[in-house]
Swiss-Prot record:
The modification N6-(pyridoxal phosphate)lysine is found at K237. Its EC number is 4.4.1.13. The keyword DNA repair does not apply. The lineage of its organism: Bacteria, Bacillati, Actinomycetota, Actinomycetes, Mycobacteriales. It is an enzyme of class 4 (lyase). It catalyses: L,L-cystathionine + H2O = L-homocysteine + pyruvate + NH4(+); an S-substituted L-cysteine + H2O = a thiol + pyruvate + NH4(+). Signal peptide: none annotated. This is Putative cystathionine beta-lyase.
């Protein structure tokens, strides 16, 4: 059995070896549990594929369909999704840039794009920077999609769509930051409403492989009524390949003609080494992923116990998927930047306010500030638990001591 990948690196190794954003954006005394990057070594089969490419000088431009074929094989095996056709895919630089390119195919400047707040901050930034209007459809209090609020947003967006008549909905499946894994029934409810109101759905499924025990991922394109939708996938989150740029845009059967209109130059953006790494991850990284999922399952249980014992007043929402947990710190009484009126321009994912600012300044623990995730985010923090048990325990211990000193 492959050992837990989360326990292979010490804090000292991470601080000395890592030069990425997670470990360099803050001083060395800060424990960084903010950006979605895992504290793991590169999966061995992925490292081997990259070494072969470098040794062979295979460092040119990407070409071919192996990435899409690997995703199709993975989807068949893991999710029993058998109708992903390679001919309805396109390689894009990464998931967010792919989302922008897909939205350009189905919307015009000024058109509405609906999101479920609180949600991944770049949803606001990338959409608004490209001239589209963000319309929030807030989640329910339990962190799940509110189908009534979504229907109201669809109706409102349809009424305000202007002469183009274009409306898009950007779905986060699984949801970041809450870790909710949408059920097949929820996705069918989305598809039915999208059909009724003429809304095109674009599903960000970058966290799809990261579902530990207890939940099941359903690809949005696999549900009835999603034939004119799109999905974006990559191996970057599940195998820690964020710096090796490549992702896959996938069209439903009725959206294939739209995807075919994507400009050819978009395919120049992905890295050839990125394509090699992502292909290897989906095709040969399954055993490593299973070991990671076991480690994440242990860590989310540990984090829940640590919060219950050491952080009174903080509510821990059990994440069904991803390696991100959403902590409700509103009972702690911190002043926080108001997010309820913000629907655009939340571009700075490192912006800090309220509890996240406190924990950085007084506990030397870097978390993501809830207000940047939009409506419903103020008073919350997002914590990345894809690290060692020792680092997780130390981080919560520091947070606890800082709150005791505040009293």
């Amino acid at each position: 059995m492959i050992p837990n990948p989360l326990e292979e690196l010490t804090l000292e190794q991470l601080r000395s070896q890592r030069t990425s954003m997670k470990w360099r954006a803050h001083p060395a005394d800060v424990l960084p549990l903010w950006v979605a990057e895992m504290d793991v070594k590169l999966p061995p089969t992925v490292a081997d594929a990259l070494r072969r490419a470098i040794d062979d000088g295979d460092t040119g431009y990407p070409y071919g369909t192996e990435y899409a074929e690997a995703v199709r094989e993975f989807a068949c095996q893991r999710w029993q999704w058998h109708d992903l056709e390679v001919s309805r895919t396109a390689i894009v630089p990464d998931v967010m840039l792919g989302i922008v390119e897909v939205l350009r195919l189905i919307t015009d400047r000024g058109d509405p794009v609906i999101v479920n707040s609180p949600v991944y901050a770049p949803f606001y930034a990338f959409v608004s920077h490209d001239g589209r209007r963000v319309i929030p459809a807030p989640l329910r209090g339990d962190g799940r999609i509110d189908l009534d609020a979504l229907q109201e947003a669809f109706s409102s967006a349809r009424a305000s769509s202007g002469s183009s008549g274009n409306v898009a909905y950007l779905l986060c499946n699984p949801h970041n930051p809450t870790g909710s894994v949408h059920t097949a029934d929820e996705l069918r409810g989305i598809a039915e409403r999208a059909q009724r109101f003429g809304v095109r759905v674009v599903s960000d499924e970058i966290h799809a492989p990261l579902i530990p025990s207890g939940a099941r991922f359903t690809p949005y394109l696999s549900v009835p009524g999603a034939e004119n939708a799109f999905a974006l996938m990559s191996a970057s989150k599940a195998w820690n390949l964020g710096g090796l740029k490549a992702a896959l845009a996938i069209a439903g059967r009725e959206a294939a003609a739209d995807l075919a209109r994507m400009p050819e130059e978009v395919g120049h953006g992905p890295s050839h080494l990125g394509v090699i790494a992502h292909t290897a991850a989906f095709r040969t990284g399954g055993n490593w992923l299973d070991a990671l999922l076991r480690g994440l399952d242990h860590n989310r249980t540990l984090l829940g116990a640590l919060v219950d014992e050491h952080l009174p007043g903080v509510q821990y929402r059990w994440p069904q998927g991803t390696y991100l947990a959403w902590l409700d710190c509103r009972e702690l009484g911190f002043d926080d930047a108001a997010s309820d009126e913000m629907t655009e321009g939340l571009a700075v994912v490192s912006d800090l306010s309220g509890p996240a600012r406190w924990f950085l300044d007084h506990a030397r623990v870097a978390l993501s500030s809830g207000h940047v995730f939009g409506i419903g985010g103020a008073g919350h923090v997002r914590i990345n638990f894809a690290t060692s048990r020792a680092i997780l325990i130390e981080a919560v211990s520091r947070m606890s001591r800082s709150l005791l000193e505040r009293r």
